[in-house]
Amino acid sequence: MESLIEKAKDGDQIAFTELMLQIKDELYKVAKIRLKNDDDVFDVIQETMISAYKSLKKLKHNEYFKTWVIRILINECNKF
């Protein structure tokens, strides 16, 4: 995962997509618990991916990537 994160930080969209695929089930579970409605869940996951992609260079510790994305997801859920 570490090398994918570095590639994604360098702008590799395929690496970023692979990272998201690796954690998609966890993102879905967290969002589903908070929102219940599948349409809202998918909207929030999409917004999370956009936000994470735009902010990826701000991630200071690559080992916390999944935690960082889940925190973004929770913040997005709170907007609903």
Task: Tell where the protein language model's regions lie, with residue ranges.
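Sigma70-family region 2
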Residues: 9-10, 49-64
